[in-house]
Amino acid sequence: MSNIKRKKTRKLRGHVSHGHGRIGKHRKHPGGRGNAGGMHHHRINFDKYHPGYFGKVGMRNFHLRRQHKFRPEINLDKLWSLVGAEKFAELEKEKSTKAPVIDLVKFGYYKLLGRGHLPARPVIVKAKYFSKKAEDKIKKAGGVCLLSA
């Protein structure tokens, strides 16, 4: 062999332990697999680099009703925009006594609020909730408020 410095691995070929001691040394998973020992022999590492990894916080609420106040709202001034301009013009042209039915729940709204003004035209509005103002304005225009479940 040339006088290039030998690497350690080449030197250790042919020796059983290859520089790792006697029986059972340098084998398999001496510290356990994965996150094993986080509460025990790897405690220092977990406390230093992953604080709060173990344990519970706070209390659970078994009967929590997350969406019980979910109530998408729309104002009166936007009410006819749900029907559409062409439908509104068609109703104006006919001058019929038929009142269109607007079901707010189908459009994804639950509550009707009273901001804005309504055209002096009867309309039947179905919703889960009405504000007092909205109800008064609809009745003033000759319409009806229907509560839907």
UniProtKB/Swiss-Prot annotation:
Keywords: Ribonucleoprotein, Ribosomal protein. InterPro entries: Ribosomal_uL15, Ribosomal_uL15/eL18, Ribosomal_uL15/eL18_sf, Ribosomal_uL15_CS. Residues 1-37 are annotated as: Disordered. One of its GO terms (biological process) is cytoplasmic translation. GO terms for cellular component: cytosolic large ribosomal subunit; cytosolic ribosome. The keyword Ribosomal protein applies. GO terms for molecular function: structural constituent of ribosome. Residues 1-31 have a biased composition (Basic residues). Belongs to the universal ribosomal protein uL15 family. This is Large ribosomal subunit protein uL15. It comes from Drosophila melanogaster (Fruit fly).
